[in-house]
Amino acid sequence: MRSEVPSSTSPSFLSPPFIHLPLLSLSSPTPLPHSSSSTFSLFSTMAASQIGLVGLAVMGQNLALNIAEKGFPISVYNRTASKVDETLDRAKSEGDLPLSGHYTPRDFVLSIERPRSIVILVKAGSPVDQTIASLASFMEPGDTIIDGGNEWYQNTERRLSDAHSNGLLYLGMGVSGGEEGARFGPSLMPGGDFQAYDNIQHILKKVAAQVDDGPCVTYIGEGGSGNFVKMVHNGIEYGDMQLISEAYDVLKNVGGLSNEELGQIFDEWNKSELESFLVEITADIFKVKDDLADGGLVDKILDKTGMKGTGKWTVQQAAELSVAAPTIAASLDCRYLSGLKEERENAAKILEAAGMKEEVNAIRGGVDKKRLIDDVRQALYASKICSYAQGMNLLRAKSAEMGWDLNLGELARIWKGGCIIRAVFLDSIKQAYQRNPNLASLVVDPEFAKEMVQRQAAWRRVVGLAVSAGISTPGMCASLAYFDTYRRARLPANLVQAQRDYFGAHTYERVDLPGSYHTEWSKLARKSDPNVAAALH
């Protein structure tokens, strides 16, 4: 995981001299100028590939096979030759797919028909720059580079500018769905040059996941918008996973439910408004037995959660844009705290010695399990609405800052299939933004407002019960606090502003008069109450 936001001012990826190669007639019977020892193809070397892909780790390999299976001849390349061989073997075993493997950047680039479109799926940061540099010398004006990794959006904007200075087109394309999605249909979020998208949209629309209202791909917008949207998608994913883990924690430790019962419950929830990929896989996880010891495998997994940085970037961007995203921030904080395993174990011992008592056992005896299960279902759904609202508000704020003109309803649509956060209620989010493209928040959409109001009593019961039992539910608590804060016409922020004016002369506005005001608070306090003056001295 990168601990800092990547710099957007690193050297150009096109530092090697750009070479404009003479046009080659790829449609002629003359073989491409590479040796047979450096290229192997499952289809005739006389035909040029329609697209290329570099980076044959799990995601790249599966996406390449997906493209080939959809009928688009593809060239692949990887610095490690064994990965090329492995991909060729898979292409043959999975149906003699039209995929050709190449072992040098030159042979790889020249095997693709013009204007070339090359997808890069390597580790974000400098490896992307290095990969582009190795390819760019053999590319020509009008060719396109497509970065499909989880890249910091400003790096994409820098590379896009570098590409333009050399006549190339550039896309930063978020790819979501994991290895299965890449192989059978991911959600794709391409942003950058529209011409680059237009050149390959016929391929992307076939490769992407398919839902009732079309393929899960759309042109996101200019610049680094595609990577930014994928980043926020991942931030929402952090929130989703945290909320589900809290539902599990309450049901297991307050409700006393077994893994078998939890598997059944999540299966049932996956037939409700909670139907989603993450709920589905959670049900599966509870059903898996440990093959090395007794009991369920999930109980043997160390309670430390990893991360790669996109959640952190999301929270940083929310702070920079003054967008409240407490549910996503809470999920990030929980990942940090999960990493403090030894500290947490030590804290548990010290606090127990100091007299800390676990209340969960006493509370468990009086719990109505059936009601608890239904309450947790409602609390989870209401909390999810708040988490998605925060992510959408962040996208709207960034779109306004950058002039991207993001279509939030369309983003919800392409997340309905293929991606990790795919869920049935994304269709409701799509419809909310179709009803009102300028919707201030999902919380105030008429349909979602009804859902929230109907579920708030159950939501409060779950959070209150968890607090009483000493079970932390930071995501649900943050979501409920967000809801309660957002719906209040007047907050205690007036006192905070008075304090700021008291110690820093930051001024304040009044509710009854226009303008800004400053008050000599300590002086007036002494005048109004002699006891205050005495206390201050």
Curated annotation (Swiss-Prot):
Q: Which Gene3D superfamilies match?
A: 6-Phosphogluconate Dehydrogenase, domain 3 (1.20.5.320), N-(1-d-carboxylethyl)-l-norvaline Dehydrogenase, domain 2 (1.10.1040.10), NAD(P)-binding Rossmann-like Domain (3.40.50.720)
Q: Which residues bind NADP(+)?
A: G55, L56, A57, V58, M59, G60, N78, R79, T80, V122, K123, A124, N150
Known function: Catalyzes the oxidative decarboxylation of 6-phosphogluconate to ribulose 5-phosphate and CO(2), with concomitant reduction of NADP to NADPH.
**What is this enzyme's catalytic activity, as reactions?**
6-phospho-D-gluconate + NADP(+) = D-ribulose 5-phosphate + CO2 + NADPH
Gene this chain is encoded by: pgdP
Give the record's GO CC terms: chloroplast; cytosol
Key word Transmembrane helix present: no
Q: What is its EC number?
A: 1.1.1.44
The kind of enzyme this is, by top-level EC class, is oxidoreductase
Sorted keywords for this record are: Chloroplast, Gluconate utilization, NADP, Oxidoreductase, Pentose shunt, Plastid, Transit peptide
**What does UniProt list as catalytic?**
K230 (proton acceptor), E237 (proton donor)
Q: In which pathway does it act?
A: Carbohydrate degradation; pentose phosphate pathway; D-ribulose 5-phosphate from D-glucose 6-phosphate (oxidative stage): step 3/3
| Compartments, as annotated in UniProt | Plastid, Chloroplast
- Name-wise, this protein is 6-phosphogluconate dehydrogenase, decarboxylating 2, chloroplastic
Q: Which GO terms describe its molecular function?
A: NADP binding; phosphogluconate 2-dehydrogenase activity; phosphogluconate dehydrogenase (decarboxylating) activity
